[in-house]
Design a protein with these regions (language model features):
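Bacterial N-terminal signal peptides
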Residues: 27-42
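Intrinsic disorder/low-complexity segments
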Residues: 12, 16, 39-41, 46
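N-terminal secretory signal peptides that target proteins for export/translocation
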Residues: 1-27
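Residue-level detector of transmembrane insertion/anchoring sites
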Residues: 5-9, 40, 148, 246
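Scaffold/interface architecture of coatomer-like assemblies
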Residues: 45, 49-424
Length: 424
C-alpha cells in the first residue's frame, strides 16, 4: 500500500476492514475457548502431578486399637480400632498368606538361592525346587521367579532417643534401599518410639519416599519419647500394610533391639502367650504372636542392629542354630543380651538376616545388600498337608525344607517354619 496514493490507500483499508472484522468477530469465541481449554488441561496436569507426589500427614497405626485374645483358640486379634491398610483384614484375625486362585489356598514361601561365593543364583524354574512340609514332599503349584512380580518392602525405623547417637549415620542413608530396588518395587516407611507412625504407604514414587524418609527424625518434636515399642511396630506394620503376596514381602527393621513393651528375657516363657484365667495380661501382644503373624503371611525380617555383635553370634553359629529356637536360659551364659537375642530369633523364624551397623562399612552398603537379595528371591506356593479329619491344614507350626536339585553348590535360605492360625 505504500506505493499507492494516500486517498486510494485509505479506501482499500476501509474495504479490507469491512471484510476481515466480521470474520475476526466470529472466530474470537473459538480462539478464547481453545485458550481456556489449554489452560484448564495444563492446570489439571499440574494439580495431578502435585497430588501424586504429595506427602500426607503421618498416620498413627496404634491409635484406638485394642488387643483381644480368643479364649478358645488362643489367637490374638485386633479390636475395632484397627486401621485396615489392605483388603482382607476386616475380621481382625491373624491372616495366613494366600496365593493362587480364590478357591485353592496355597502356602507361600519366599527363598533365596546362594552359590558357593554367597552370590544369589537366578534363572531357576519350578522344576529346580523341592518343597517339604513336615518332611513330606508337596507339589509346587505356584512359582514366581525373581523380578517377575514387584517386591514390597516396609522400612520400620526406630526413632526413639536410645538410637540418637547413631542417628547421624542412619538419617539419609535409608534412601539407599529405595534407590537399589527395582523401579516397580514398592516401599513403605514406618517409624516408631512409644507409638507407631506410617509416614507413607507402599509406593514406587522415589521422590515421595525420599521425602518420607527425610522427616523420620522429627519424632522428638512430636513429644513421643515414652519408650520403644519395637515389636508392636513390626506387628502393626505386618497386619495393616501387607496383603496377599504376589512377590517377595519384607520388613527392614533398623533398631537397637531394646524393646520396652513386651518384657522379654532369656526365659522362653516371657515370649509366649499367657496361659490360665483371663486377666489384664491375657489380652496383650507377645513375641510369639508376632512370630506367628509374620510366618503366616510370609513376611521376612531383615534386622539392622545399632548395637555390637555378641562375640559368639558369628554367621557360622547362627547357621548352626537355624532350626532351633535361640531363646534359652543359656543365652545369658553365652553373653547374648535379650535385645539382640530376640532380633536374631525373629530373623531366624522369618528367613531374613541380621546385620550389625557398627561392623558394616556403612548403612547404605547394608541396605543395598538387602535390596539385592530381595530382588533375587523366588516365591513358591504349595498346598499344605491336610489334617486327618478334614481337608483343612493342621493348625499350628509346620516345619519347612526347600532343596534345589541340579546345583550342588546351592544353599537355600528360607523361613524355618510356617504357621496356620487356629480358628473356631
Amino acid at each position: 500500500l505504500t506505493s499507492i496514493n494516500p486517498v486510494t490507500r485509505k479506501v482499500l483499508r476501509r474495504r479490507l476492514a469491512k471484510k476481515t472484522l466480521p470474520w475476526l468477530s466470529a472466530a474470537l469465541p473459538f480462539v478464547l475457548l481453545i485458550c481456556v481449554a489449554a489452560f484448564s488441561i495444563s492446570f489439571a496436569l499440574h494439580v495431578e502431578a502435585q497430588q501424586k507426589g504429595k506427602l500426607s500427614k503421618p498416620r498413627q497405626l496404634d491409635k484406638g486399637i485394642t488387643w483381644q485374645r480368643d479364649p478358645v483358640t488362643g489367637e490374638l486379634n485386633l479390636g475395632p480400632g484397627l486401621i485396615n491398610g489392605s483388603e482382607g483384614e476386616k475380621s481382625g484375625e491373624p491372616r495366613a498368606g494366600v496365593i493362587g486362585s480364590a478357591t485353592v489356598r496355597l502356602v507361600p514361601v519366599t527363598c533365596s538361592v546362594l552359590g558357593g561365593d554367597s552370590a544369589v543364583i537366578k534363572g531357576l524354574n519350578s522344576g529346580n525346587f523341592r518343597v517339604y512340609d513336615d518332611e513330606v514332599e508337596r507339589p509346587i503349584q505356584y512359582f514366581s521367579a525373581p523380578s517377575s512380580d514387584p517386591a514390597r518392602v516396609a522400612m520400620v525405623i526406630d526413632a526413639s532417643p536410645s538410637v540418637f547417637p547413631d542417628s547421624v549415620q542412619m538419617r539419609g542413608a535409608e534412601s539407599a534401599l529405595v534407590d537399589a530396588l527395582a523401579p516397580n518395587d514398592e516401599v513403605a516407611v514406618v517409624d516408631f518410639a512409644a507409638h507407631t507412625f506410617l509416614q507413607v504407604g507402599f509406593s514406587s514414587d522415589r521422590e515421595l519416599l525420599h521425602r518420607a524418609i527425610g522427616r523420620v527424625d522429627v519424632r522428638e518434636l512430636l513429644g513421643d519419647t515414652g519408650g520403644s515399642n519395637i515389636y508392636e511396630a513390626v506387628y502393626l506394620t505386618a497386619r495393616q500394610l501387607f496383603s496377599a503376596p504376589r512377590g517377595p514381602q519384607a520388613i527392614v527393621l533398623i533398631t537397637d533391639g531394646e524393646d520396652s513393651g513386651l518384657g522379654l528375657t532369656t526365659d522362653p516363657a516371657s515370649a509366649a502367650p499367657p496361659a490360665g484365667p483371663r486377666g489384664m495380661s491375657f489380652d496383650r501382644l507377645t513375641f510369639e504372636d508376632l512370630a506367628r503373624t509374620l510366618a503366616a503371611a510370609n513376611i521376612q525380617v531383615f534386622a539392622i542392629s545399632t548395637e555390637n555383635r555378641p562375640k559368639i553370634m558369628t554367621a557360622a553359629w547362627l547357621a548352626k542354630h537355624a532350626d532351633a529356637t535361640l531363646v534359652t536360659p543359656d543365652a545369658r551364659k553365652l553373653g547374648i543380651p535379650p535385645y539382640t537375642l530376640y532380633l536374631a530369633e525373629l530373623v531366624r523364624r522369618t528367613g531374613g538376616q541380621l546385620y550389625f551397623l557398627r561392623e558394616a562399612q556403612s548403612l547404605s552398603d547394608t541396605l543395598r545388600q538387602i535390596a539385592q537379595r530381595v530382588s533375587a528371591e523366588y516365591l513358591l506356593g504349595f498346598t499344605p498337608l491336610p489334617s486327618t479329619d478334614s481337608d483343612a491344614p493342621h493348625r499350628g507350626w509346620h516345619s519347612l525344607r526347600i532343596e534345589v536339585v541340579g546345583r550342588t553348590d546351592a544353599t537355600v535360605v528360607h523361613q524355618a517354619a510356617y504357621y496356620v492360625p487356629a480358628t473356631r
